[in-house]
């Protein structure tokens, strides 16, 4: 797998040709295959992240905290620990000095806006969805974000969406309805509230994706992911938790057993962001997003293993239909000028 995450790049020889690639025509295919592999891996990490967070929310101090406070405190702790993992990775790969420089740029500010939308807003809705509807159901609905991204791109970026793309959007929404229409067995009295809050995450991540793709024209993906996570935790700690009285819960969590559970979830979350941004960089967002959305399928697997979930045929069918719709959305998207510019940046003409 090409090590874009580790920061290695083909070394050009005296003629300017990428000497690390002996067959020039193989470079794009090799990079794209690596990007698709990273996208699959990122989905697995994110599925594990959501299920492990669901376990943590059922532990002290979150289980005893107010319904509004617990998911927000868990989100702040998760993003803070994930930021620590990602900063350590940047330091290990020699990128630490790029963080403040990127943050001070215009594209860095765009990333901050994406972080607020995808972090405190979307992530909080996602965690409330897990708390009230269960991890597998919340993840199934939030997996429709590629379709949301397609709609937003059409409206705000004026990107064309083909008939196949619109069909995919309809199929994706239908899959989410199939997966979430009937409450699961068990004590989940606020199931539909959880579904509505998971929908907030879906919209928020769609908006975040559009903003982040624009910002990554000038900011390296690994650095962009780290700035996104760091901005999110700052907003949680400075703004959100003080407003809801959640700082004592966060402080209590730092000395509890649940800290280690969230630490594991944060490691998976950090790995997911690193691999997902690498996938976008190598394969392009239109190819990486649907494979990443397989996290809903991974969530079922991890829920069965870690929580003893017995998935219903309806849930499994809904997830599969959702993923099929996501594939239709991105396979029906025409190549835009941004896609071609991204290819030029990743695969210079001299290396082709």
Name these PLM-found stretches.
Residues 41, 77, 119, 123, ...:
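Helix-helix packing/entry segments at the starts of transmembrane helices
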